């Protein structure tokens, strides 16, 4: 693995207008001839063309403008021979806002792939209420790799960069990373499960593909001490552990009391024999 390097599209020092805030906290890797860099406004046309080839989604122009210029998004590209061959787009947001937002359908065309709604209510159960009040979460909007470069670790490289970005001390408040995927997208499911994402919930008719509702999954990866809400079984295990701990403590105290009683009895007996 090569040393970590910073790659800029124009081979010039990054400017404040074309780089992401806090980009110095993101390890930008170079593996062989593949390098990672943040998107810049000049990437809009190329990224739009790639997304139209990779995904059957008709994103509005404003979406491409946002991910190539706004600091709201973590938008990272994998570059080979000056061409973008992979892309990850993610967003950090307060957990309490996850279910307050509604994402409009990307297109009215039946030939295009659109979401029926915003974040489903099932996503509200990603974190416990006590933790979620002050926690942030990372949401992966898009992760794609050019067909000719798949199975070469490009997707893992992009995801690792995001994970490293979210597990720094500055972002300890981010307790989970989650995403949505079609239940029929087996390659994506296999990829995320291999990367320690776990199935959180089933989303019936979450997607609209060519006018037909399609089911989706929510997958979650817990980081920075985050964990899912406790189930009844978790509570039972917790209290059982407390009982075992209490029983062990009682047994230890009983043993200590017995030792003290024996010592006191021995002292009394010794003193009585001495007096006689």
Curated annotation (Swiss-Prot):
This is N-alpha-acetyltransferase 60. It comes from Drosophila melanogaster (Fruit fly). The active site is at 139, 180. It is an enzyme of class 2 (transferase). Acetyl-CoA binds at residues 143-145, 151-156, 185, 192-195. Residues 204-215 are annotated as: Required for homodimerization. One of its GO terms (molecular function) is histone acetyltransferase activity. Disulfide bonds: none annotated. Substrate binds at residues 59, 141, 207. The lineage of its organism: Eukaryota, Metazoa, Ecdysozoa, Arthropoda, Hexapoda.
